[in-house]
Each structure stands twice: as C-alpha cells, then as structure tokens.
C-alpha cells in the first residue's frame, strides 16, 4: 500500500515536470527561433529565461502585447538580469517586423524609470546611468558581435536591468487593434569573454551651417592614445541637413575607411566592410557634409529638429585586461590632415525622396537662445572612462535619464561651464535626438525605389552566421589582396589552375543579391537573383514565416541567361514569381529547378514556357517539416539518369529530401547538429548539392559545419567527409565535374585567418589542388558556384551582387569530357596513374616532384601531360621493335600468322589511344593491378566508355570507386 501511495505521488508530480522538460534540441531551436511561447494574437511572456547549457542562457525581452494609439509612440519595458554575478551579452536577435516597428533600442541600467509592465518613454528610460547595448532600425541589418566579444553586465559594475525602447512610427498597421510583442532576444554567457565591447563617440559641437546651398564640412579628429581597439561596426547620425558621414583611421598619412553612410538611411549599427584596428598614435577622423538648403536662418548644433548634429558611433572591442568601455572625441586637433581626405568623403550619397528617414523631433522652442548652445570644449580632445562612466556616457548615445523628456528636449539655460557639464550636455543632445526619429511607413518603397543603393550600402550581409572578420592594420582596396591571400600557393600542383577572366564584362552586371548560378545545356550562364529584395534580420519571424509579404513579389526578372563570352543578357524571366530566391540548378533537359526561402517552395520551370511552373513542391508561405512542407529550402539536384529529385531543406529542418520525378515524396535523412564535432548525417544548414552520377553519390555543402558530406544515392549511406582547415567555418557551395570538386567558403570568424576564396579539389582524394580569388572586386559572401567541364568556373556573390568568371590556364581540351560521347581515355588513365602515385607518397614531396616533371616535360604554351608524351613516343618504338623481332625470328610460312597477331595486337593498343576498342590495354587497371599501387581513390572514368565492360566484379568496382573513409575532423 505504501508503494502504491508513492507511485501515486510520483504520477502527480511528474506531469508538471514533463511539461517543463525540453530536450537539448528544442532548447537550441527555441533560442534560435524565439525564446517565448506565443499564444493567440501575441507572444507570451511566460518564460523569458531559457537555459542553453550549463553556462549560457537566452533572455527574451519583448513588449507585453501593446497597441499604440498614435504615430510616433515610444514604449519602454524592463527585464531584470536573472543573476547577480557578472555575465556577458554575446549575441542579439531582433524580433520585430518592419511593418510595425520603426526602430528599437536596448539599454542597460540599474534602475528603470518605471516598474510597470511597460510605460511611455516620455517618463524616461532609467533613473540612473543608462548604456545602449543594441540598436535595430527597419531596413537595416542586425548588429552582430564577433566571436569572443561581449558586453559586460551584472556583477559589481554592470547593469542589473535591461530596458527596451520601441518606436512605433506609422500605426496604420494597428488598425485591427492587434497586439505587438516586438523585442530582442539576448544570448548571455557566464563565461568570461576575452574581448570586451565598447563605444567610441565622435561628435562635433560647434558647427555652423549658413542658409542656402553652400556645402559645409564638419570635421572631427583626435589622437588615439590607448591600447589597440578593433572596430567592427559603426553608426552615423545627423538631422535633416546631413548628406554623408564618413569615418577614417589615419596612420602615417594613409587613410583607412571605417564607415561611410547617408544619415538619411536607417541609422542602425552597420558592420565595417573591412576590418580596422586602431593603435597608439593613430588619428581618428570624421567628416559630416551639410548644406543649408531650405533654411532661412543659420543652423547650429543642437537638440531640436531645427538644429543639426554630427555624430559617428564606433563600436569596437579590446582585450579584456586593457578594455576601456567608452571613449569620446569632440574636437578637431589635426585640421590640416583633412586636406588629404579621400574624395569620397565629400560626395553626398543620393537618397530618393521616398527613402529619406523622417525625424520626428520637437520643434524649436520660441524662447530658445541659440547662442547658449553647446560651445567648444576646453578639455582634452579624447576622454576615457571606466566601466561605471561607460554606462553613463553610453546612455548619451541614444538613451535617457530621469530628467529626459521625449525627443530632443534641450534646456538652453544649462550652459556647459566645465568639462563634466559639457559631456552631460552632449549626452542629453545625443540621447534625445534618437528618441525622436519617426516613421511614415515608406519601407516598402525604400528598398524598391533605389535597389542598388540599399543593397550596396545597407545590406552588406545576409544572415546572422556572416560574422565579422578580425581587424587588421592595412588599407584595403578592390585590387589589393585580402588578408591571407596567397597562403595556399604551395599547394598548387600545377595540374589544374583557374584565374579570373579579366576581359569578361559580366562582373559589372550588378543584379540583385546573387543567390544561384548554373549552366544550361548550351553552356550559357544562368543567374538567379533577388532584384530589389534582400534577406536580412527582419525578413522572418521566430517561426520562419516571411514578414515582408506586403512588398509583393519581385517586380523584375529574377532569372537571367547570360552569354558566357560577352556577358550579354540572352533571355530573362521570373518576374512577379519570387520573394526571396535562393537555389538554382538545371537538369539535362534544360529545366530550371529553383527554391524560394520566403515561399518555402521548390519549383520546376520550363525556360521556354510562360505557363507557370511545371512542378511545385511545398506549400506557399507555410514553413513545415513534414512530407508536404519545407522550411527555407536551399538547393535542388536532379539525377540525370533517373530523374530523382533531391532537395536540401535547409535553414530550419537540416535534412535532405528525396522525391520521384513526378514529385512524390520518397524518403528523407539528416538531422540538426548541436555539437562542435558533428557526426555524419548531421547538418547545420545543408546549403548546396552536387550529384556525382558515375559514383552514385550526392555531396552536400554542410555550410555552418564547414565541411562537405557525401552519401550514396541508393542507400543514403554516408560515404565520406571532406574538410580542410582552409575552409574556415563555412562551406557555402559546391560544384562537380568529372574528377574535380569546386567549393567556396564564407567570411572568416573573429581570430580566424582563412580568407574567403574558391577551392579546386581532386574528388577522389579530396585534396586541394588549387585555390582562386578574383582580381576585380573581392569575395564577400560567395553564395553559389558552377563549373563547366572545360574548367570554366562561375561564382555568384550575395553581398557584392557580382558574378565572376574564372578560366583554366591549361589547354582544357586535354581534360574535356563529354556527357554522352566518347572520352579521351588515355588522358584519364594517365591522371589515374598520377593520382595513385600521389596516394602512396607524402603529399608535399610528391606535389613538388609532379611540378618539376611538368616543368621539364612541358614546352612553352603546351598543356600536354608528360605521361601522354612518353606514351605516344614509346608505343610506336615498341611496335616497330616487335615487328623487327618477329620478322627475324619467324620463317616465311609463319609470317602470315604473326602478321595477323601483330595487326590485332597493335590495333588494340592504338584503338585504346583513340578511346575506342572494346578490349585491350587499360593503363589504369594495368598499374592498379601491380604491387605497390592501390585502386582506391580512382574516379570512375566514364559511364559510356568501353572501360565499363571490363569491370571484373562488383566488389572490385566498389573498391575502385568508393571514396576513402572520412579523415578526422580538424580541431577548431
């Protein structure tokens, strides 16, 4: 009886425990997608804190279901840090829709201005020091912290509360009175971070702008006198008259761009395009360009909409032991250096009228004494503060204190009479200006109106995994090599090398974000791009539902057929069909297979038909993980022999799905990887597919795991992994041609040295035999790659909106292989011999020997392999010697038989050299059968060639054509 009572108690207790239980996978996905439970109209508020592991947790900070009643409403709410000890914010995930929210600011402080669920921000943000940790603006990319970088919170000096401020601009989206739960999800860790984030504020305080069209430059410069800081993001800020704001590091007279942006575009933090480090003795310089057009009076620096501001916020990190959390620069200590400022700093960035950000500031008060505005400080040009002061001055960037009234309230009676007073005045001006930005819901037209401007200057990155690179002390230009360039030169075997085709004009096409490239049966290049649509942090909600449906489909042709020689557009299609194009592949019949991550669908298109898709897989705008749904599918591969369809499904589901040629679901495999050392068959964004028909394999670019996985198409059995340290942490795309595998990686993470580049690999061994980069422009996010069988390679970049063409430096006819014809077998077999030798000797020494042999044997301009030349010279000599011996040895009566045998024998040899003949000498099999040589690692030479009839048995064929076992994953 006692046992029964115990069991009853357990049953009563356990259900509640089961409700709260979450598997590690669900916790991971929950943080990735959302950290709150949604119900009815709005996100719930039941579980703001979600454990990730023993040291990390997610904190969800969201509005508790609010409905603004008038435009330009600012709501604030607070969440207490769920711990007293020190922690570090290492990532931010915005949870806002551009249709409802204009911008969001996240502050840290020790006492919020109110203890209610939410309040009007007119009441203030915090009653003590407030620091800005995060800023999000519509149509702008989210702020990302590099790996190892964190903002300090908690502990003795850090903030105890987070305060979220949300600005609702145009409230027409709330006509249905729905509730809004916009906010931000934080990823925090208890582990000390080696690098601490901070802010450097450059601000002009004495600029005077006369009325009229005269250009006025407001210059700021300071000597940097601290430990090195590494810049990774920036934000510009002016009012209506600002045309462009530019920031630079000046070292030994050399100007290095930190950031340049129009202040009339969304004023969030943007990543620096190239890493910049600032060391002791450098000069930091900034210029704001103004005109007084439309004004009838002189304009000064101040806090109302009639005044102006010139601010550049530089977000940086420093080593923890030397970290200074906040620094300021408010003077121009080196005015002479601006004589050599790059001309770009003086060129306004044009912004269409429908793209201008409206600034809803308080109008100038009638009794305002303009002469009492901020005056030139009489302090050291650069102030450095410790942790506590950092929070005080960070609040001045965009925050509020208890005495702050909504939007740019400026008290002219409070003159700056001392250094501390001046800094306080600056703080009030900065924080209150940003509270006043308003919105007129022009978002849909902003991107559409000037696509190139938005794409090139705002959306320089596409997904959160595109982390920022380490800062380096160099000036980068389009023609200069990137960090780490050329480090793979010793690995070039000379066997295959590609270089950019500098005479190809296609690099200047500049379509939208290039998501896919492929080659049609006529060898024309086909580009799949996003037009004026972009994929950024605002595109999807936490459940992967597309949030910008109101923009409508892309109103321009998204599929371009390009002449491979002169880059002329031969054909275009795909208008008003897609929202966010992603993958593109072309089957043997020339049909296009495309994916759209917003629609969560796969389409089969006939390029010659205008009747719509031939086949559609998935449900429009409905993410899911069953047999009838996808969730942001990335790529498609179609088996040329069977017509079987393979889909990589993709960003959310981490699986591969197989369909019949008619679109019937067959099977799926794969799962999400949560560990640092993922297992075979686990994925973190299966991003690109490449079929290897001769071997019956499907290879997958496992993007976020930085590797390539190959599987058998019939059994789905894992075959091998290809992973190299030079890949870095991402492999975005792959392409296969007989014997070779091409790939492109992604932008390196913080402290990683691997550059963004393309790779050529021996498919059998997986060894890298060449790397390549463009000369014109540079890779930023190479998103897809396509290779033709003559060795021409095309790479499309989603950030630079560029397509490059690379060609082989060899005579490609010696490596050409026809899809449905006779191959030049002797070339393939000679390569097989070389590959076999390379497997049996150390790679480095063997590569040297191969290079030396090729140098000795090759004549200038010749690409003929040494083995081929030797074969062509030796065989006729052997045949002639054999004939002479037979003539001398045989009598005249036996001569006829000998002649017939010789004729048959020589016919087989010469026939083999022509790639014909059903039997005879097979150099690959001959050498592979000799002691000391292994057949393992050979490529299947052809599916149509006569060699296939010579396979002795199934087991031997399997050994010859299976890939080697996966090598141990390198530590990272």
From Swiss-Prot:
Membrane topology listed for this record: Single-pass membrane protein
Modified residues (Phosphoserine): 929, 942, 946, 957
Sequence positions bearing Phosphothreonine: 943
GO cellular-component term (any): extracellular region
InterPro entries tied to this protein: 6-blade_b-propeller_TolB-like (IPR011042), Cu2_ascorb_mOase-like_C (IPR014784), Cu2_ascorb_mOase_CS-1 (IPR020611), Cu2_ascorb_mOase_CS-2 (IPR014783), Cu2_ascorb_mOase_N (IPR000323), Cu2_ascorb_mOase_N_sf (IPR036939), Cu2_monoox_C (IPR024548), NHL_repeat (IPR001258)
Subunit structure: Monomer. Interacts with RASSF9.
Descriptive protein name: Peptidyl-glycine alpha-amidating monooxygenase
